[in-house]
Amino acid sequence: MSKINKLEHIRNIGICAHIDAGKTTTTERILYYTGKSHKIGEVHEGGATMDWMEQEQERGITITSAATTCRWQDKIINIIDTPGHVDFTIEVERSLRVLDGAVAVFDGVAGVEPQSETVWRQADKYNVPRMCFVNKMDRMGADFYRCVEMLKDRLGAKPLVIQLPVGIEENFKGIIDLIKMKAVIWKDEALGAEYFEEDIPADMKDKAEEYRAKLLDMVVELDDHVMEKYLSGEEVTAEEIKRLIRKGTISAAFYPVLCGSAFKNKGVQPLLDAVVDFLPSPIDIGIVKGMEVSTGEEKDFPISVTEPFAALAFKIMNDPFVGSLTFIRIYSGKITSGTTVINTVKNKREKIGRMLLMHANNREDVKEASAGDIVALAGLKDTTTGDTLSDIDQQVILERMEFPEPVIELAVEPKSTADQEKMGLALSRLAAEDPSFRVSTDYETGQTVIKGMGELHLEIIIDRMRREFKVEANIGAPQVAYRETITKVCEIDYTHKKQSGGAGQFARVKIIFEPLKEVKDLKDEDKNKIFVFESKIIGGAVPKEYIPGVEKGLNNIRETGVIAGYPMIDFKATLVDGAFHDVDSSVLAFEIAAKAAFREGMPKGNPKLLEPIMQVEVITPDEYMGDIIGDLNSRRGQIQSMDPRGNAQVVTANVPLAEMFGYVNTLRSLSQGRAQFSMIFSHYDQVPSQVADIIKAKK
């Protein structure tokens, strides 16, 4: 197969969903039926191939996205298995950035759950075409049609039903294919490898006709010629329907909905057919956004084998056998072992050593990879998540990923002097792997503080520190990661002068600080940022080479705010004027001036303390509703909605994270263990003044 042809045959897909919807099981079945796995791994036995970290096998959840390659028909499918637990949404975000399409797996009993909504929003952000697989159709209480309604109501999605279930709960035995208008039934004794087509059961004929008509109504809208044919009563062929479903899926006009039971081995092969038939190849995506280093211009780069090499590093992983592995998605050109490329974000050269195709935790050495491939590189020195690797002669920086701010922090102390050094190494390695995990030192206490997206996230980091790096540490109680911001515009003109013997230092900066939400002409790419810097220097008042010093100074100093030393977020700094000295000015002098300007200027911006607000969803039997709502209100919660779901009630509320520690035990006692809850970070909001005073006093 020629390289150019090969691009059409690649599908880079992610499998993502809520925890326990059956993503890993679905992936396991895909590997089994595509011949990559000779024994089916069961998650609840701790044997799943994709869940290869010890912590994942023990907990039965997927933490890191393992990438694997398999073949179906004559296509190459690169699958990224993503975690569904809210503490690991960053993994999902990174995966979606480099995928061309996704399969969203839903639990046939629970339908669209909170984490499903988060993943769906993330996929919207990156415009990832996707289809839906309603799983667990064999389970008690499974309801395919309710799930389809929830896709509309909760996600605002336009579902295109292309299959219907045959039988429900323990009698679920197959599907109706609405494109071919045939029933597909699986034989239980053959582990789902054998299935056959038959006529649609008589009692389902009417329903199948009804959903087939809905399907045709939606797809013919995409093609005038087929629409005329359909309206004049002519038969629309299966090929035409498939072509239009593909067109609509790629343009996100709708989302095909399939069903099955991965655990019971039913519905997986048609899902694979649909991945190949409907999800895009790299050619369908066509372009990737980036910046040309030589000109600084933003432009669209074609995805092609014949273009210069460009790839995005989207994950770092420590492998016990190979050491540090950097997963890259190649967007254009090709690469061979032994080549030298450049990391354009860090401006450092990297030599490509071993190149591996990954199958969960098995690996295959390859000598060459090209556009569309996802490979792991061993031994890169300076590359971290979100960096671009590029051809040395034609350098580009691909669009970077934005990572959320951590919401929870813990103090960690090594148990012995021997652990001290090992802990530093372990934490820096783990932080390189995971951009949503941060490590810092508290200047006042000298303690090492680790920050992450939730209690489970930090628990697993500490667990990995013990197991992989053999570090024993004492762990403090979890603390809320507060932030600070300004609420009004302020301007500061600051001059830094030092002329006492030897080389002097001189830098003058005039900076306007303003709250992000008050910036009128904020660029689209800056809307999700927590700090925006812009230079409006005209006529060389501050030479170009010194301006990065101003940005660096502000970026460093904003980590310790002016109220209680928490990082400052959601503001814009604009450098409007300044002055320099031919001899005494330097990048460092401007960095120092910017830091001092921040310290002096920020108190004038009416700074306020911010706290993380969580979206909490509680599912409870009716009789405990009153107590649960009363308790949420007492935690400074704001009830957003109350909806019935089956025979239970679903309460959604926004509650400060500071009030949610230990909530699991309270909920258990309020509902005699019958209610359950989940929470996702929603946004930062101002802390009420009486609470802010207590926080400041503690600092």
From Swiss-Prot:
Record key words, sorted: Cytoplasm, Elongation factor, GTP-binding, Nucleotide-binding, Protein biosynthesis
Q: Where is the protein found, in the record's own terms?
A: Cytoplasm
Question: Which of this chain's residues are annotated to bind GTP?
Answer: 17-24, 81-85, 135-138
The family database entries (InterPro entries) matched by this protein are listed as: EF-G-like_DII, EFG_II, EFG_III, EFG_III/V, EFG_IV, EFG_V, EFG_V-like, G_TR_CS
A Gene Ontology CC term for this entry? cytoplasm
Q: Which domain of life is it from?
A: Bacteria
Record-linked Pfam families: EF-G_D2, EFG_C, EFG_III, EFG_IV, GTP_EFTU
This protein is called what?
A: Elongation factor G
Which species expresses this protein natively?
Rickettsia conorii (strain ATCC VR-613 / Malish 7)
